Amino acid sequence: MACFCLSAAAACNQQQKPQIMETKAKNEVIETIMARRSIRKYKAEPVDRQTMQQILECGINAPNGMNKQSWEVRVVDNPEVMAEIKGYMTSANPDMDPAMVEGCFRDAPTMIFVANDPSYDCSPVDCGLLSQNIMLSAWSLGVGSVCLGSPVRFLLNSPEAMARLGFSEGYRPIICIGLGYADETPEAKPRDMGKVRFVE
């Protein structure tokens, strides 16, 4: 069967949509990386716990510095808990439009909150690697995802929301990931290969 991988045929200094070329052997990892899109519109159908467990296991098997595993992960798939957290965030951010706070999770039925250990300087990198594993493994299982930064700002202003998530003392949210079944099919966006060079 054929697979798809990045083509180097186009000029390096031009932005372009990811190009694909047919190869003889199927490579599911490359296919997943090239096919994944950020999803911002979801069906109401929840992601079952068994599927989530597999996705999360892939996440914590990400590379990380000295195997410190300098992350904590909280998963919210209960609509009532999600509404509670949104309420805390809205109250703690009175200068923000409530609709913006309400919509910051893109109505994803499952939310993952990733916190880092600020005492370890490579912890943000570790959390990024964990998050990428989560999003790629989710896509391979038919689950869409979106990486979100705005909710982190709202969370950090809300002691009640932070307490509800139950992170250990000192850990700070750094990434939020929405997951669910896609209700849209986004087009690939251009990537700038001019930012990548071999040093001769």
Regions found by a protein language model. Name each.
Residues 8-200:
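Acidic, surface-exposed loops and disordered segments
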